[in-house]
Amino acid sequence: MKQQFICERRPKADPRNIVLGKNYRITFLTDRLVRFEYNESGAFVDEASQVIWYRDLEEVPFEIKQKNNFLEIQTKSIRIRYDERAFDESILSVKLRKPDNGCDLEWYYGKKEDRNLFGTARTLDEADGRIRLEKGILSRDGFAVLDDSKTILLTEDGWIKERKHGGEDFYLFAYGHDYRGAVKDFFRVTGRVPMLPKYALGNWWSR
C-alpha cells in the first residue's frame, strides 16, 4: 500500500509497562487501563488491531510481588491478583481502590457485566425498530471489558491479516464511575474518530 494511505500507529507498548510470563502478558496502558493476554503457545500480538492503534503511552509505575502463590501487581489505582495460569474466575481478579464512592470495587475474570451502559451498533443495515447495542467501555459496576481477541490485525505496510495463534487478548477499563476519564483514555489508545469535512456534505437548506 502506498505510504500516503498508511495511517500513523504506535502499537508497541513501553517495555517498562509489561509483566511477561511464559504464557501470559500483562500490559499497563494507564494506571486504570490494562491489557491481558494469554496464549498457550507464548505468542503475543504487537501489531495494531482494528480497534487499538496506540499502546505506547507514558510509563505507568507499579509494584509487583509474590504472595501465597499469587502474583500481585499494584498501581496507584488498582491491584491485580493472578496465579499465572489460564484465565479463570478464581485465577484472575482486579480491585479498584476507593473510587468516587469511597469503597473498593472488585472484578474477576468472567464476571457478568449486568450494568454495562452499552456502546454502539456496528451497522444499521436491515434495522427496523429497536436494535441490539454491543457492550461498551462504561459500566455502573465500575469495570468494563473490551475483548480484542478476534479482531483483524493491521500490518506495517497498511494491509490486514488474521490472528494466527488464537488465545485471549482483552482490555480491562477499571475507572469506577469516572466515565469521562474512561472515554478520554479510550480515545488515547484508539485514536480520534475521523469526521467528515463540512464541504463533503454539500449544501444544506431548510425553511
Please state what every model-predicted region is:
Residues 2-13:
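Short, Gly/Pro- and small/polar-rich lid/capping loops
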Residues 4, 29-68:
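A low-complexity, Ser/Thr/Gly/Pro-enriched, surface-exposed linker/loop concept
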Residues 6-8, 53-57, 116-120:
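Short Pro/Gly-enriched beta-strand edge/turn motifs at strand-loop
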Residues 11-13, 21, 28-31, 63-72, ...:
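Short, ordered beta-strand-loop transition motifs
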Residues 13-15, 22-24, 132-134:
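Generic recognition of flexible, low-complexity loop/linker segments
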Residues 19-23, 75-78:
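Glycine-centered tight beta-turn/hairpin loop motif at sheet-sheet or coil-to-beta transitions
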Residues 65-207:
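Catalytic and substrate-binding clefts that recognize carbohydrates or anionic sugar/phosphate headgroups
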